[in-house]
Design a protein with these regions (language model features):
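Active-site-proximal alpha-helix that buttresses catalytic centers in soluble enzyme cores
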Residues: 6-198
Length: 198
């Protein structure tokens, strides 16, 4: 992953955490070459992205802020091929499916700043992310949302977040094209992180 020096962005964040949901970490891997599995390779085959761009964003935030990382991992995994997953993901959304997680959800009572990352599926957050926000109260936190998308941007996700969390204040938001190269994604996202420290 890319190496980025610490910056003024880390100042003023207080106790911070990066919580994220990444597709490549929530798939059935039986019979797959695990080293080849990423949100990029699973979706599109080997190419210009070594890892999914959401993980690029997570890595850059961690390097520049020193925040604790907490990945959300579900017990019932998705299909490993992206196109096999998307129809089921729509059914999950329409039926308000309730996922369970491999680990207890994080205690953020002493956290000042939350960076939260996820993909955008069907113009919304994945259902496991919705389930997370149904259970963990973000009121009073400095909340920054980052995502990857395939043309929708953050669509109506911020409004959806506010429906799930009436006490939530979104301090900043950013969405990257999931199909960018890792290099261009890192350059673009770093520029956004720079703006947070100004």
């Amino acid at each position: 992953m890319m190496s980025v020096p610490l910056s003024a962005m880390a100042e003023g964040l207080g106790n911070s955490i990066i919580i994220y949901f990444d597709y490549s970490e929530n798939i059935v891997t039986d019979g797959l070459d695990v080293d080849a599995v990423s949100s990029a390779s699973v979706a599109e085959g080997p190419g210009v992205r070594e890892i999914g761009n959401l993980l690029v964003m997570v890595d850059l935030i961690e390097q520049r802020s020193g925040a604790t990382i907490y990945p959300l991992r579900i017990t019932e995994k998705y299909a490993p091929m992206y196109m096999d997953m998307v129809d089921g993901a729509l059914e999950d959304k329409e039926n308000d499916r309730q996922f369970t997680f491999e680990q207890p959800l994080p205690d953020i009572s002493d956290v000042d700043t939350v960076f939260f990352g996820s993909p955008i599926w069907w113009y919304d957050m994945p259902q496991p992310v919705v389930n997370f926000f149904q259970q963990v109260d973000m009121s009073g936190k400095r909340f920054m949302y980052f995502s990857i998308n395939r043309g929708s941007g953050n669509s109506g996700v911020i409004e959806r977040l506010k429906e799930l969390q009436p006490g939530l204040t979104v301090a900043a938001e950013y969405s990257l094209d999931a199909m960018q190269t890792n290099e261009s994604a890192a350059e673009e996202f770093n520029a956004w992180l720079d703006s947070l420290g100004k």
